[in-house]
Amino acid sequence: MCALRRLLAKAADFIRESDKILLIICIFTSLYGCAAVFSATHYRATYRPFLIQFICFAAGVVAALIISAVDYSKILRYWYLAAALGVIPVMLTFFIGFAPEGTDDKAWLDLGFTTFQPAELLKICFVLTFSAHLSAVKPNINKLKYLIPVCMHGAFPVLLIHFQGDDGTALVFAVMVVFMLWAAGVSKKYFLAMIPVILIAAPILYFFIMNDDQRDRLTAIFGVLNFGAKRDPNEQWPTYQQWRGRTALANGGFAGQGFLNGDFTQNGIVPYGFNDFIFVSIGEEFGFLGCMAVILLLGGICFRCLQVARLSKKDSGKLICVGIFAMIFAQAVINIGMCTSVLPVIGITLPFFSAGGTSLFCLYMGIGLVLNVYLHRNSRTIYLHDNLK
C-alpha cells in the first residue's frame, strides 16, 4: 500500500511540476498539422501519410514525457553516446542511403517498413553534445584555445549534412550553432569578425559550390529570372513550386475555401503540398486566418522554449532550450519564407505540420528535453516522497 501511495505521489508531483503550457500548445499544433496532412493527401486516396503522422505524433508525446522524467544533467553525462547515436546513422547514408521519390539526396535509410531521415535525430543529439561542450568551457569561452574547438564542433554537423547533399538542413544547423554560441556568451567581436568572412565566402559559395539549380532558385527571388512572367503551366522551372504556391495562397483569401475544398490542394496542383509546401495547402483551405494560426502556434512554442531557458538555473539547461528554439524557429521561418516566395526553395519542412514521421517524432524528443529542463529547473529533485507515511 505504501508503494502504491509513493507511486501515486510521484505521478501527482510529475504532473504538477511539468510544463503543461508547452505540451498543450504542441499537442494542439500537431492535431492541426495532422488535419492539414489528411486534407493535403486526400486527393491521393491513401491514408498512409496521415496515419504515419498521427502515430508518430502519439509516440512522440509519449517519448517526450519519458525523456522529461530523466534529469537532463544525467543525460548530458553520456554525451558521447548521443554523438554516436546522431552521427553513425548519418554516415550510413553515404553508403546505403535512400532517395525518396522527388529528391536526389540519399539522405534517408530504408528500414523496410518505413524510411528514416538520420539528420533529424542528429539535430537533437547535436543539441545535447554542443550544450555539454559549451557549458563545460563557458567560463573561458572567449579564449581562442577553447573557442576554436567549440567552433569546430559546431561546424562538423553543418559540413557533414552539406556533403550529404541536404543544404537546407545544413543551414538549420548553422542557425542553431549561432544561437547557441550567442547564448553561451561568445563575445560580439567574434560575431562582427564573421561579417567580412561571410562577404568574402558568399561569391565563392555562389559561383563554385552551388549548382545551376540552386543559383537559379536564389536569383529568381531577386527577380533575375522574371518571376512574374507567363509560363507554360506544364513546364517545370526554378520557381515553379513557388508560382503554384502563391496562386494557391491567393485562392484561399481571408477565410479559405474550407477543409477538403481547396481547388489546388485537392487536385495535387501544388508540388509537395503535404510536405514542404503544406503552409500553402493550409493557406488555401483555411485562408489568412489559418496561416496566422500556424504562425501563432509555432511562435508560442518558440516563446515558451525561451521562457524555460530563462527559468533554468544551469547553463546546460539554458543552452538545450535555446538549441531547440533555434531549430524550430529556423525551420519555421525558412519554410514560410519559401512558401511566400521571400526565400528560395531549399527543402525545409514546417515543424509539426509537414508530413514526415521522423521529423515529428524527433521534434517531440526535442520538446521532451525542454520539458525536462522545466521539470528540473530548480536545484532540488522533484517528485521524491521518501518521507511518506
Where are these regions (language model features)?
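Membrane interface segments of multi-pass transport proteins and intramembrane proteases
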Residues: A69-Y80, I96, L111-F113, P139-K143, ...
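Juxtamembrane membrane-interface segments at transmembrane alpha-helix termini
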Residues: P89-E101, W182-Y190, A202-D212, A229, ...
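Hydrophobic transmembrane alpha-helices and their immediate junctions
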Residues: L289-A332
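Hydrophobic, glycine- and aromatic-enriched re-entrant/interface helices and adjoining loop segments
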Residues: G102-W108, A193-C291, D315-S316
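Transmembrane alpha-helix boundary/anchor motif
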Residues: V62, V70, T129, I209, ...
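Hydrophobic alpha-helical segments of polytopic membrane proteins
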Residues: V62, Y80-V87, K145-I161, D167-F207
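Membrane-helix boundary/helix-loop-helix interface segments in multi-pass membrane proteins
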Residues: C2-I24, F28-T29, A35-G165, A326, ...
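Interfacial segments of multi-pass membrane proteins
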Residues: L134, L171, M176-Y190, D263-G290, ...
